[in-house]
């Protein structure tokens, strides 16, 4: 049978399965593809194909993730599933697989477990906007009171970590029954996809956000002012617009007098484009790599923030020893390294390689940042950790 071509006309959403080990995340992922394949919305993908997830490198960290794609009548989805707990932690912190929403899988037989909590907390920290719950393995629970109890526990846990626990759709079903083609199993998968379609909001496209471009390089063209190059991260820049140069020094205002791409002049540059931008009246020495060009007022420089960080294990090429309070590595934001000091919470003496931790950072120079910004921690040029800004403190 010929493969159905995916329609790119539908809005696209990135999603992923999260939850405790052995609660059925991978079985559910397989079940979604198998049920949707019946209406031509997916290629049926077996459990073993998803479980044998390839390794990928993201910001110097090796992560195993499996990707499947499927579509409902309203949307096109890219779905990520990770084999191991450590892969989830790394994935969510590095943003290797960006999630616009998540499906939290909880076994009805066990109820919420330690990793259920940790994944909900991580989702909150890294800014996953919404999630839907799939209460799996209901075929193993005969007592309806017990099911109600588990549902209440899940709702309380979601509320505790700042999600709207009372509103979140909870779908009860069995991924195994869906894989076996049983009608009640398939019905639950269809209900789940309806909930995902309606409850997980459509993400704001990069081009609709305010203009931002990290500066990678600076050139001066004799008689034609200064050109900065980089890849536009978000928004659109038009010739003649005012922009700010933010980070490392005091914020400066300038005007874009030209946009170039592949040596051709354009009227505008947009998210995803690698461009050169001509700046009016800005001297070569006033701009440097590590700053950003941005829409005026849209982003501010900061030097103190809280972060959620994954610290590489020795086997991953990270440190061999733990670090303590006042550790001073380099923090790599977008295009440059800045030295910073780590302040651990009062109850934490040290952070071991392989851990994930929350702490405060004080940089020696301010960087243009907003909550959700990803960074790497480096020591002598090698990556020893990856993090995400969870709160700005100044």
UniProtKB/Swiss-Prot annotation:
GO molecular function, one term: guanosine tetraphosphate binding
Protein name: Elongation factor Tu
Annotated region (G2), positions in chain: 60-64
Leader sequence segment: none
Alphabetical list of CDD domains matching this protein: EF_Tu, EFTU_II, EFTU_III
Positions of region (G5): 174-176
Residues given in the record as GTP binding sites: 19-26, 81-85, 136-139
Residue span(s) of domain tr-type G: 10-204
Keywords, ordered alphabetically: Cytoplasm, Elongation factor, GTP-binding, Hydrolase, Magnesium, Metal-binding, Nucleotide-binding, Protein biosynthesis
UniProt catalytic activity: GTP + H2O = GDP + phosphate + H(+)
Enzyme Commission number(s) of this protein: 3.6.5.3
Lineage per the UniProt record: Bacteria, Pseudomonadati, Pseudomonadota, Alphaproteobacteria, Rickettsiales
HAMAP family to which the protein is assigned, alphabetical: EF_Tu_B
Annotated region described as G4, given as residue ranges: 136-139
Naturally occurring in which organism (per UniProt): Rickettsia parkeri
Residue span of region G1: 19-26
Binding partners and assembly: Monomer.
Pfam families per UniProt: GTP_EFTU, GTP_EFTU_D2, GTP_EFTU_D3
PANTHER family according to UniProt: ELONGATION FACTOR TU, MITOCHONDRIAL (PTHR43721:SF22), ELONGATION FACTOR TU-RELATED (PTHR43721)
Coiled coil: none
Binding site for Mg(2+): 26
Function: GTP hydrolase that promotes the GTP-dependent binding of aminoacyl-tRNA to the A-site of ribosomes during protein biosynthesis.
Gene Ontology CC terms: cytoplasm
InterPro entries documented for this protein: EF-Tu_GTP-bd, EF-Tu_GTPase, EFTu-like_2, EFTU_2, G_TR_CS, P-loop_NTPase, Small_GTP-bd, T_Tr_GTP-bd_dom
Similarity comment: Belongs to the TRAFAC class translation factor GTPase superfamily. Classic translation factor GTPase family. EF-Tu/EF-1A subfamily.
Subcellular location: Cytoplasm
Annotated stretches, region: G3: 81-84
NCBIfam families documented for this protein: EF-Tu, PRK00049.1, PRK12735.1, PRK12736.1, small_GTP
